[in-house]
Amino acid sequence: MAMYCEPRSEWWTRLPAPGGHRAWIACSSALSRSAVLAGTPARLPVSTSAFLTHSFSVCAEQPILLAIDTIAVQRDGCSPSCSRTRRTARERTSGENFFTGLLIRPSSQVNRSPLIPGRFNPTETERTGESAQETLTRLVQAALPRRYPAGAPPEVETQIAHELRLIGSLSYAPYFLTVNTIVRHARSLGIVCQGRGSAANSAVCYVLGITSIDPVRSGLLFERFISTERQEPPDIDVDFESDRREEVIQWIYRHYGRHRAALCATVQRYQPKGALREVGKVLGLPEDLTGQLSKHIASSLADPDLCKARAADLGLNLKDRRLSLTFHLARLLLGFPRQLGTHPGGFVLTEDRLDELVPLMPTAMDGRQIIVWDKDDIDVLRFMKVDVLGLGMLGCLRRGFELLHTVYQTRMDLAAIPAEDPQTYRMVQKADTLGTFQIESRAQMSMLPRMKPATFYDLVIQVAIVRPGPIQGDMVHPYLRRREKLEPVTYPSETLRGILGKTLGVPLFQEQAMQVAIHCAGFTPGEADQLRRAMATFKMTGGVSPFRDKLVNGMLANGYEQEFAEQTFAQLEGFGSYGFPESHAASFALIAYASAWMKCHYPDVFCAALLNSQPMGFYAPSQIVQDAQRHGVEVRPICINASRWDCTLERGRNGRHAAVRLGFRMVKGLANGHGAALIAARMPDYESIDDVWRRADVPVAALKCLAEADAFRVFGQMRRAALWSIKGLADTALPLFEAADRGRNFPLPEVIEPEITLPMMSERASVHEDYRATGLSLNGHPVAFLREGLRKEGIVRCGDLPYLRDGRRIQLTGLVLMRQRPGTANGTMFVTIEDETGTANLIVWKDVQEKYRRPLLASRLLACKGRLQKEGDVIHVVVLSLEDRTPLLQGSEPLKARDFR
């Protein structure tokens, strides 16, 4: 309203422009509707002046934010006045005069309006006259035989009856029916999905097929999901295949109607790179300079001294007032709200029209709309929200199950995978987990040889323990020492034994923290839930510190020692927002186990499925293929007559595994449609490049991409010869040949080149071209061609590290696969490099990072000197110095590192 009432507002300046009368009509119409609403009983009208900041403390940022907005508007062809904040008294009161009496000054006069129950949950009954609770009960009873073919155990039936009673008393049945409807539809389309989070605590969700973890067998607590004390609606997160999630989202819009369905918003905040770029534009810095600042200074922006040091390294003039002001203002903007984004999958569904309840806005993606409030606002208002999330590994598993059925005639799904397979666990204990879900990261691979998971619950702990929460709470090392029998497991009381027995006396899960607070410190269930919420929102609320006295004093009153009480609080405080719910860890552990089982028993299937699911995970296709080859899988190159779009399986030579045929999807620059055209016209097989050009009707550029990927070897033409042949082709025929083609079913080539013999490409050049065209090579490794020179320098191979003495000083050189800097590592960076024999894990301390910053961040081929560090089967190299050896690649860039994932 303030925008309409302000004479110098943007719409006002547009009135004299063509079409300005329409702006006046729209404004008048909006004000008239507001006047009608103002007179409606039971409505509280409010008129405000222009809103600038929420707090006086951010007034320094307000001009810079206004300037950023102004630049954006000017770029779009409109120049509003920049002096909107300097208004006369008459202008400031114009809004008040327009609606006399509507300006509310004291905030105490505005009372919270009660929400109208029943407007927020869609009706999901399937039969006339049947209530939602009756429908839910009927569906659960009908689904029981599918989950328990031999009959449900008595404890399961008791738990289901308890849950249904609680769901009915809280009127949550429509919510369960809505989620069940969405999951059933997704599965009817062949989309793999699985609920996770606290929903895995529910036997009702398990029986309906929403989740895949049996909570009764796993001992999960239903009250972590729903309880009468919490009085808040349940929250069910459902993961769908990432590349098919949009199908589910659009079906929800169609099924419930766009007037009843919308996604939540997220508040996107200024990060260092964006803050430097935007402030640099406002202050008129050259674009190349702002690019340099965002690239080299952003990571140190929060530290003024380090920021100046890096600017000096770049040769920047620190006496330049604009430069120092850029750093200062960008630092002020860090964490400040920038714009609204779209929540990854938080769907709000209502019975009434959404636009009568909440403000809506369209998104940049066609076919979507969002509510301009975030998920926390939605939770407070008690709207029904379903999280429709994407998980790439589910798509990978679905593709793997399809290949298992096609190639090995084995039907498999998540529920049918053999449980507690010893061979799978032996593979996991060796950290042979590249490509698997959740346990493939550097940190997980380092932990697996120490944890040695041998049961599913071990895997649940493995998923949960390599998290910032347990690390910050100093829970990891005590647990590992107790697991390795290096430290005795003691329990100060039998109560704690019952709570922490499964995790050897160390609280690893949120549920355990709640139970410790209830049973050992005298918290009520409601207070324990407040503790859980405090742990989940520590960034906004300041953590669990307000609960310290109550927790410690409560434990002292129950006979626990002061030291133990303080230690317990410190561990819970360390959880922060990263304390993992046990149910969430169990859901992820199931997918981790399924992916590890497939990799162990069908590495050919797993490799093909993983390649067809890219991009996802930590590792590039090159590492996935090399890992499959180490497991005895034959990988065959892209072939114009044998490849399909996806990677496929063919009869292998060794009889044990099928061979993986790389698909057209691996060819950089080749469109899916062109790949489909090549396959559709391939009956019978192509006989030459000219034959492909005639029959497939794809652009010459597509043929060039295939030639660069060496896909025409079946014709006896290697990469250079194929590229030479394609030079004689064109997308559009010349008039003479076009006239000759009118009586033919196919065009003639424009130029018939004489046969020539081109020199063969060297093996090294061929490998480099493979990487450039497909991101991998089956013909060798780039570092292998440098090995002779590296050996003379005393550089060892990555594959030799297990056989070298602990503490020895060594030199290594390899391609950089990834760089990681976890928030819990106190600035330490972890780098993985690779040569022709394997990988090596580097630890780069903070002081070494600063000294060798450029080679560390810019190198594709990195050389290091360091000290070998061994702890059991875990091997690292602690870096002492670094050198950029990228020039040895002679201009070739084999692959791009997957940094900071």
Curated annotation (Swiss-Prot):
It is found in: Cytoplasm. One of its GO terms (biological process) is DNA repair. DNA polymerase involved in damage-induced mutagenesis and translesion synthesis (TLS). It is not the major replicative DNA polymerase. Belongs to the DNA polymerase type-C family. DnaE2 subfamily. Its EC number is 2.7.7.7. It catalyses: DNA(n) + a 2'-deoxyribonucleoside 5'-triphosphate = DNA(n+1) + diphosphate. Keywords: Cytoplasm, DNA damage, DNA repair, DNA replication, DNA-directed DNA polymerase, Nucleotidyltransferase, Plasmid, Transferase. It comes from the Bacteria. This is Error-prone DNA polymerase. The gene is dnaE2. Pfam families: DNA_pol3_alpha (PF07733), DNA_pol3_finger (PF17657), HHH_6 (PF14579), tRNA_anti-codon (PF01336). GO terms for molecular function: 3'-5' exonuclease activity; DNA-directed DNA polymerase activity; nucleic acid binding. GO terms for cellular component: cytoplasm.
